[in-house]
């Protein structure tokens, strides 16, 4: 360095000179230094840390560090480890020229620009400090992208990397790059990359590629005249990646969609697919968040079907559509509005075209729209409801229930006397009801009025610390605008006035604590009994069935049971409920429920459904089945529930249910659902179509990893009917994800008799942080 060399030469000369010579030479050197310092033409100096440039920019102070600096007029020159800083920008190079008037930096040799999450390297560059605009040649750069985890998006910590012959920085977040390739893979040997003669990178928005192509292992596989890929969270409008696939029932599948996001709070997707063997489908999704707390989602899926050909028979058309709408919003005054609508043309359409087994086997269609407001212990609701349950698909039979409109008001228990333990509550509603069914043709004309008022008085009593008795008294008055007579609707009003008594008895709770090491266990036994008495229903068969309120019957019963809980506490953490086991049964003093029970057929009453959802009453009986509900939750790796119904009158199990979630090792998982029921026989015989005396089905999924986990991921699943001895659904999914991309393959089979017997083959290529290409979309779940 010039300064260092100068100081070394001066010291050597002084060692061999006389004092007078030294003084003269020192004076001469000082004069020369003074002349250099005051000369306006040029100036030299050692690298001075954080030396401000002479002209300050409008946005603040720019500083420069270098091994050597000099000034020639308005131009500053710096060489060797040059470091220019301005606001959040840092420019490094071997040589820099800075024009103090135009505030332009011209850099050469090992140019590096760092700005927030941007890192750009180039051979040379021209950069404007004031505007942030610049041009770089022979560029390499990385831009960090933050993506939130999504079920269908592979996430990689790698930044977006690009190389280009030239990059124009248009502003702090926009780059126009030429003859470039981009990837999120490691730059040494990228698995994939986009090549484009021209591309525009808008940070936190998108990357737009013009006349480019997608390359896999440097081999072009897809030409892209114009493509947009997302960068971070912002959405961009445009055409989606085409869908390609093949199934045994649809044939070859070719489809595409267009995505439109005109506003930050609204977007829409419209698409269509051609099925070579069947016809074509249409789909659409609309999402909107118009204001805070409001959600609006709408979707449509339809198929125009040429028909399914089976064994040379004439084509059977299974086309139709399903449209869904969901709207939720908080309104002024504490009101909440909800509309959850579902319109389905037929059960056959759902069975034939649903993407997952869970959707296909759902035979219910529910619609609800309501306004609700909770205030001061009261709840006020206005609703319109619809429920349709398909019993068979071919021929199609169903039961339809509608309520429109309905107003309901209720209250929680409230004490009107400060010194007396007496609490009052009530429930009241009025509305119009409709019922229609195809099995035994029946339909109410229009809507039938139904109103109810039910005040309740509750008196909690405590006898020391060992016994609590809580009696409740309810008077329920219900009016129906019509009634049933011999299975025929009669347009004649009818009142149902009932007196109801409930006595809840809570006995002493037994508990014991076991201590061993760092883990403490607590065993709790909670016995209980509830007595119920209902009188006044009388002729149960006259009342129309619109919902569970209409299945109220006379009863005189006692329910008794015991709940055992095992708690576990490790160290100083909170106690967790490890095991819960509930045993319960009912004894009926009135085995005919006031004459409502019809022998020889399943009877569905409110008091029976409250115990178990599996019908068991086809004759007069005193004892109900014993219901056992065992739940084991030892931690995050294991969760299971066993439900068993044992009928002592028939001396056999009538229902067995198992739900299991288990993670035996690291990312491995097992999910299982099994239900076996013995349905009551129907009278008269023979039973109706599709009736099964015995039902025994199992569904299971097991595997390792998930769709977006790095490495190998495998999922296997099946649904098997033991009675029909047939698989209804099978799935095999294998995927491998690297640091920047992944590939997945899937096989699915649906078997629904003559309606659908289909093999599906799907493939997907996942591009980390950007999206995916292929027709493997949704992962199967059991619960």
Language-model segments: residues:
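Hydrophobic alpha-helical signal peptides and transmembrane signal-/tail-anchor segments
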Residues: 3-9
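Bacterial N-terminal signal peptides that target proteins for export
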Residues: 9-30
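Outer-membrane beta-barrel proteins and related beta-barrel translocases across Gram-negative bacteria
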Residues: 118, 124-182, 187-197, 202-203, ...
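Charged (often Lys/Glu-rich) extended helix/loop segments that serve as interaction or gating elements
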Residues: 46-183
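Bacterial N-terminal signal peptides
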Residues: 27-40
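Detector for intrinsically disordered, low-structure N-terminal pre-sequences
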Residues: 4, 22, 36-37, 53, ...
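Sec/Tat signal peptide C-region and signal peptidase I cleavage site
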Residues: 41-45
């Amino acid at each position: 360095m010039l300064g260092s060399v100068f100081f070394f030469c001066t010291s050597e000369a002084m060692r061999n000179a006389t004092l007078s010579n030294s003084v003269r030479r020192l004076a001469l050197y000082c004069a020369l230094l003074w002349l250099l310092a005051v000369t306006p033409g040029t100036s030299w100096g050692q690298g001075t840390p954080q030396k401000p440039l002479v002209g300050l920019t409008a946005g603040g102070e720019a500083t420069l560090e270098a091994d050597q600096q000099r000034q020639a007029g308005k131009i500053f020159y710096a060489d060797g480890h040059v470091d220019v800083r301005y606001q959040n920008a840092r420019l490094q190079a071997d040589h820099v020229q800075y024009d103090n008037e135009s505030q332009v930096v011209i850099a050469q040799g090992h140019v590096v620009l760092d700005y927030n999450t941007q890192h750009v390297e180039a051979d040379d560059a021209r950069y404007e400090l004031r505007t942030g605009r610049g041009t770089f040649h022979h560029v390499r750069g990385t831009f960090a992208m933050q993506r939130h985890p999504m079920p269908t998006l592979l996430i990689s910590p790698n930044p977006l990397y690009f190389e280009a012959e030239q990059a124009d920085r248009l502003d702090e977040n926009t780059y126009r790059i030429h003859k470039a390739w981009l990837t999120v893979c490691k730059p040494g040997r990228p698995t994939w990359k986009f090549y484009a003669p021209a591309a525009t990178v808008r940070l936190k928005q998108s990357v737009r590629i013009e006349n480019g192509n997608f390359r896999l292992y440097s081999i072009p596989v897809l030409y892209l005249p114009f493509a947009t890929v997302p960068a971070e969270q912002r959405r961009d409008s445009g055409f989606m990646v085409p869908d390609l696939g093949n199934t045994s029932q649809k044939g070859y599948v070719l489809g595409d969609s267009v995505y439109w996001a005109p506003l930050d709070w609204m977007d829409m997707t419209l698409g269509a697919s051609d099925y070579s063997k069947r016809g074509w489908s249409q789909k659409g999704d609309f999402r909107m968040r118009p204001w805070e707390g409001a959600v609006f989602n709408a979707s449509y899926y339809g198929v125009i079907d040429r028909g399914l050909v089976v064994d040379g028979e004439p084509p059977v058309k299974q086309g139709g559509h399903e449209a869904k709408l969901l709207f939720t919003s908080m309104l002024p005054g504490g009101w909440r509005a909800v509309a959850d609508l579902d319109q389905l043309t037929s059960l056959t359409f759902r069975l034939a075209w649903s993407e997952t087994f869970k959707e296909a086997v759902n035979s219910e269609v529910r619609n609800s729209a309501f306004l609700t407001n909770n205030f001061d212990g009261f709840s006020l609701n206005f609703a319109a409801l619809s429920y349709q349950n398909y019993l068979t698909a071919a021929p199609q039979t169903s039961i339809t229930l509608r309520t429109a409109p309905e107003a309901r008001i209720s209250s929680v228990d409230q004490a009107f006397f400060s010194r007396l333990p007496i609490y009052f509550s009530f429930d009241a509603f009025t509305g119009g009801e409709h019922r229609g069914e195809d099995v035994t043709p029946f339909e109410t004309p229009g809507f039938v009025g139904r109103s109810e008022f039910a005040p309740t008085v509750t008196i909690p009593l405590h006898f020391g610390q060992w016994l609590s008795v809580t009696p409740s008294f309810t008077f329920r008055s219900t009016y129906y605008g019509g009634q049933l007579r011999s299975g025929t609707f009669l347009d004649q009003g009818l009142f149902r006035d009932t007196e109801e008594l409930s006595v809840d008895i809570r006995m002493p709770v037994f508990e014991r604590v076991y201590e061993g090491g760092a883990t403490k266990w607590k065993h709790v036994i909670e016995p209980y009994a509830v007595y119920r008495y209902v009188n006044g229903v009388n002729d149960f068969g006259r009342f129309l069935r619109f919902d569970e309120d209409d299945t109220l019957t006379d009863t005189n019963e006692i329910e008794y049971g015991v709940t055992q809980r095992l708690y576990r506490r490790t160290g100083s953490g909170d106690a967790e409920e490890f095991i819960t086991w509930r045993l319960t049964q009912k004894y009926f003093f009135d085995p005919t429920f006031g004459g409502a029970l019809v022998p020889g057929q399943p009877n569905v009453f409110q008091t029976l459904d409250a115990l178990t959802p599996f019908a068991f009453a086809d004759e007069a009986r005193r004892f109900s089945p014993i219901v056992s509900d065992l739940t084991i939750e030892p931690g995050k790796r294991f969760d299971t529930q066993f439900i068993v119904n044992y009928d002592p009158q028939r001396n056999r199990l009538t229902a067995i249910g198992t739900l299991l979630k288990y993670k035996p090792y690291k990312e491995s998982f097992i999910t299982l659902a099994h239900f076996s029921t013995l349905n009551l026989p129907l009278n008269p015989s023979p039973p109706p179509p599709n009736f099964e005396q015995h039902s025994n089905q199992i569904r299971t999924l097991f595997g390792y990893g998930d769709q977006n986990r790095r490495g190998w991921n495998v999922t296997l699943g099946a649904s098997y009917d033991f009675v029909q001895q047939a698989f209804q659904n099978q799935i095999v999914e294998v995927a491998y994800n690297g640091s920047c991309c992944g590939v997945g393959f899937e096989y699915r089979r649906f078997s629904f008799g003559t309606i659908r017997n289909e093999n599906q083959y799907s493939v997907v290529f996942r591009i980390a942080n950007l999206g995916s290409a292929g027709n493997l979309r949704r992962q199967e779940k059991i619960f």
